[in-house]
UniProtKB/Swiss-Prot annotation:
Keywords: Chaperone, Chromatin regulator, Coiled coil, DNA damage, DNA repair, DNA replication, Nucleus. Component of chromatin assembly factor 1 (CAF-1), composed of pcf1, pcf2 and pcf3. Interacts (via PIP motif) with pcn1/PCNA; the interaction is direct and occurs during S-phase. Interacts with swi6 at the G1/S-phase transition and early S-phase, but not in the G2 phase. The CAF-1 complex interacts with histone H3/H4 dimers. Belongs to the RLF2 family. It is found in: Nucleus. Residues 23-35 have a biased composition (Low complexity). Residues 56-170 are annotated as: Interaction with DNA and pcn1/PCNA. Disruption phenotype: Viable vegetative cells but sporulation is inhibited. Decreases the level of pcf3 protein and decreases nuclear localization of pcf2. Abnormal heterochromatin organization at the peri-centromeric and mating-type regions; heterochromatin formation in the sub-telomeric region appears normal. Residues 351-388 have a biased composition (Acidic residues). This is Chromatin assembly factor 1 subunit A. Acts as a component of the histone chaperone complex chromatin assembly factor 1 (CAF-1), which assembles histone octamers onto DNA during replication and repair. CAF-1 performs the first step of the nucleosome assembly process, bringing newly synthesized histones H3 and H4 to replicating DNA; histones H2A/H2B can bind to this chromatin precursor subsequent to DNA replication to complete the histone octamer. Plays a role in the maintenance of heterochromatin. The lineage of its organism: Eukaryota, Fungi, Dikarya, Ascomycota, Taphrinomycotina. Residues 74-117 have a biased composition (Basic and acidic residues). One of its GO terms (cellular component) is chromatin. Residues 325-396 are annotated as: Interaction with histones H3/H4.
Length: 544
């Protein structure tokens, strides 16, 4: 309820009471007269005075009522203001409380965010640490792999060098059949040093040469229970008068166990290998890889002696000894199926002569006069005689060992070849003929007289050539600059250089290449880095 409604109600009640007082003036007069304490009022008052008095009282009452009503309204207004102020304070306190709550929540949220950031930073540091550790381990592993790779490459290079050395030795041994050894300059050994070295060697080292385990080899150990040093010392220091035998040291059980460890069995391994080889060569076999795996399990022997000139034997040996396992107890037992008097070393021994290298081969021991164009009726007659002499001389350099005869043919292809008769030539061109590679001049008159030879031959340099007499060689004049240029840039020895020149000039024979090489160039030295020097007479022919 507001103040205006209260004021209207108070005024209405006051006017009503005033009216009631005015209407009951008689009652008031009577009351005033009848009152024992009233001494002022007299009965003589008139009615008008009474009415005036009553109105005055009514007015005074109304004024007091109005004053009372105003004070009540002011109290109510103060009370309302106080209530509103209290409500305002409550609202402010609630707003402050909400503000503080909001700030507290915000601070808690910020604190949580800071904690999350700290946790994330800690996790990030841990991840970075793990990543650094992983990179360090990876780098360490990479360096280790690089070291291992370098070590493997070094071992592989060393193995390849050893194989190259062995292959070179084998090739050199094979080349000894075709080339004679030159005079080797041997330095006189120091006698004092040899004597001192001989004194240092004991009887065992003098009897048995040093042995080295090579690639793809393994040293088998004899499984004897009595091979300790103490037992051998006791046997060697014994004072018995009779000589010791192998049976006194090694028992038969040791021999049997040794035979089993070496892969010796009672089965006929020779026949087994032959069956495997025949099965592998059979085209109807569906799985040849299984046969190869069986062949790879056969033990391989490497037989080589330091005094041998021939290459060592490297392969399978499955023949059984005629004496069986007794050969394990007595290695000097001779097999009845082997001819020990035959010396195959003679096939590899070459005669030592001082004639130098012989570059002839069997397929070139023919007359090479057809490979050149004659410069007259009597051209190169002396050279042909020289070729015959060189062929006869090369025959003396051949090995004196027995030759194996191989007979092949005739082979008739009656099922396949008839279908292509219409496509074949009457006389096919031979790929081994030197005339196939000769260049044919399309402008040359082949039906002209043979007496009118061309001014400059393709295979010789005659008197009409631009070269002088001391520069005449039996080599195509147009290829001499190319020949000299290749020789000058080469570091190969004479044998390999001639072979390379043969591949470069297939239409020129080996004799002419060797002769031309000896005339135009000379080797600087014998080392690999040394090359060839072109003689001054042919230096002007180098291509610019």
């Amino acid at each position: 309820m507001n103040s205006e409604s209260v004021d209207s109600d108070v005024a209405a009640s006051t006017s009503n009471k005033g009216n009631e007082l005015c209407s009951s003036s008689t009652d008031i007069t009577s009351l005033s007269v009848s009152s024992p304490n009233e001494s002022v009022i007299h009965s003589s008052h008139s009615a008008s005075e009474a009415d005036e008095y009553v109105c005055k009282l009514s007015y005074e009452g109304n004024r007091k009522k109005r004053i009372y009503n105003g004070s009540a309204e002011a109290g109510k207004e103060k009370k309302l203001q106080k209530q509103r102020a209290q409500e305002e304070r409550i609202r402010q306190k609630e707003a402050e409380r909400l503000k503080r709550e909001k700030e507290r929540q915000q601070r808690e949220q910020e604190k949580k965010l800071r904690e999350q950031e700290k946790i994330a930073a800690k996790k990030m540091k841990e991840l970075e640490k793990l990543e650094k550790e992983r990179i360090r381990l990876q780098e360490q592993q990479r360096r280790k792999e690089e070291r291992d790779q370098k070590l493997r490459e070094k071992e592989e290079a060393q193995r390849l060098r050893q194989e190259q050395i062995l292959n070179k030795e084998r090739q050199q041994l094979k080349l000894n059949n075709f080339f004679t050894k030159g005079v080797e300059k041997r330095i006189a050994p120091n006698e004092n040093f040899v004597a001192d070295k001989t004194d240092e060697l004991n009887e065992f080292e003098k009897e048995f040469r040093p042995f080295f385990i090579k690639h793809q080899m393994s040293l088998s150990k004899y499984p004897s229970p009595n091979e300790s040093d103490s037992f051998l010392d006791e046997v060697l220091s014994t004072s018995k008068s009779y000589p010791l035998k192998l049976n006194d040291i090694f028992t038969p059980s040791d021999a049997v166990s040794s035979a089993n460890s070496l892969g010796v069995s009672n089965r006929n391994s020779e026949n087994e290998v032959r069956q495997l080889m025949s099965a592998y060569q059979d085209p109807s076999v569906s799985k040849p890889q299984e046969i190869l795996s069986c062949l790879s399990q056969i033990p391989i022997k490497f037989i080589f002696f330091y005094q041998d000139v021939r290459p060592p034997y490297f392969g399978s040996y499955t023949k059984t000894h005629s004496h069986g396992s007794n050969v394990l107890l007595n290695p000097w037992l001779e097999d009845e199926d082997i001819d020990y008097t035959y010396d195959s070393e003679a096939e590899w021994v070459a005669d030592e002569e001082d004639d130098g290298e012989d570059l002839e081969s069997e397929d070139e021991e023919v007359d090479n006069s057809d490979d050149i164009v004659e410069d007259g009726d009597n051209a190169f007659v002396d050279d042909e005689d020289d070729d015959k002499d060189s062929v006869n001389a090369s025959n003396t350099h051949r090995s004196s060992g027995p030759l194996e005869v191989i007979v092949e043919g005739p082979v008739w292809d009656s099922k396949f070849l008839p279908d292509f008769n219409c496509l074949s030539l009457i006389e096919p061109i031979s790929s081994f003929s030197a005339s196939t590679y000769l260049q044919i001049d399309p402008k040359e008159d082949l039906w002209a007289s043979q007496d009118t030879a061309p001014a400059s031959s393709g295979m010789t340099i005659g008197p009409t050539s631009s070269l002088s007499d001391d520069l005449q060689v039996r080599f195509p004049s147009e290829d001499i600059p190319k020949f000299i240029e290749y020789v000058r840039n080469s570091h190969d020895n004479k044998v390999f250089l001639i072979e390379n020149l043969r591949h470069m000039f297939p239409y020129v024979t080996k004799n002419i290449i060797s002769e031309t090489l000896g005339k135009v160039a000379v080797r600087k030295g014998k080392s690999v880095s040394d090359g060839w020097i072109i003689k001054e007479n042919f230096a002007s022919l180098l291509s610019s």
